[in-house]
Amino acid sequence: MDAQSSAKVNSRKRRKEVPGPNGATEEDGIPSKVQRCAVGLRQPAPFSDEIEVDFSKPYVRVTMEEACRGTPCERPVRVYADGIFDLFHSGHARALMQAKNLFPNTYLIVGVCSDELTHNFKGFTVMNENERYDAVQHCRYVDEVVRNAPWTLTPEFLAEHRIDFVAHDDIPYSSAGSDDVYKHIKEAGMFAPTQRTEGISTSDIITRIVRDYDVYARRNLQRGYTAKELNVSFINEKKYHLQERVDKVKKKVKDVEEKSKEFVQKVEEKSIDLIQKWEEKSREFIGSFLEMFGPEGALKHMLKEGKGRMLQAISPKQSPSSSPTHERSPSPSFRWPFSGKTSPSSSPASLSRCKAVTCDISEDEED
């Protein structure tokens, strides 16, 4: 049994494991099943300045080997991840998920930079700092949020928050006059790399909005926003309204075209059905006509039968046995009407002559 089972396992097709959207592996593109769990976080992650910290215990950083083994058991590994988190999207959530799952027992601290630092070093944001704090607070992987996080991490900040490792993608982040703001963290052995999610970023989202600015401006005008709120001039407002009407007319024309195409298609289908039915009926009619009036049709047989009956009625055939002529044929003792008396016993010569004459008369009557 063991040999058979091992042979079956070896003969199976090797399935490719691909990371799924939920971080689990997928087999041949099919998401792996997970057990349904109704337990979830009911409160947002607290801010760091709202948590009481026991500074009486000394801060001893955990090494990478100990963190991977899940030790020490008395406390989790404290991992720090920072960012701007403007227009919080799935790329941010995936990065925080990776940071949370770096070690078996992880406590994730997320630092969010303020508007002042962000505007000075990176540029203007769509969301203000309070909105960005709130967005990160409600991410399920976050255990603690640090407001007004520093742009460059200092030893004092790391010691204050008792940070063991810093999680970020390993692409050099040049800013604030430095080629890589995480260079000293990497040199200290505290850097834990994560993978960036391709195809999604705050800059990409803003690019989409700017690229289709007219579409979104018309959309918001249609939903009740004023031109002043959208910072749209009077001329552009009228232009957008006109474009909206033109689009409605185009949509109606397109609907009419589609309906007309459907109608024409239905008519064509009906006409094809009618033609097929007409062909079938015409074949049946021609077949029945030929059966009745063709060379070997029923009508010809009827005429032949009628003609035969008429001829039989006009001149019926007489059978030789029932012919009246045969019944009236004279016997050998035929008497001539002009002979008055019966002659006495005739001679043999006269009798033979009478027989010959009688036979000739009988043959003439039959003819």
Curated annotation (Swiss-Prot):
It comes from Rattus norvegicus. CTP binds at I84, F85, H92, K122, H168, D169, Y173, Q195, R196, T197, I200. GO terms for molecular function: calmodulin binding; choline-phosphate cytidylyltransferase activity; identical protein binding; lipid binding; molecular function inhibitor activity; phosphatidylcholine binding; protein homodimerization activity. Signal peptide: none annotated. The modification Phosphothreonine is found at T325, T342, T358. It is found in: Cytoplasm, Cytosol; Membrane; Endoplasmic reticulum membrane; Nucleus. This is Choline-phosphate cytidylyltransferase A. One of its GO terms (biological process) is CDP-choline pathway.
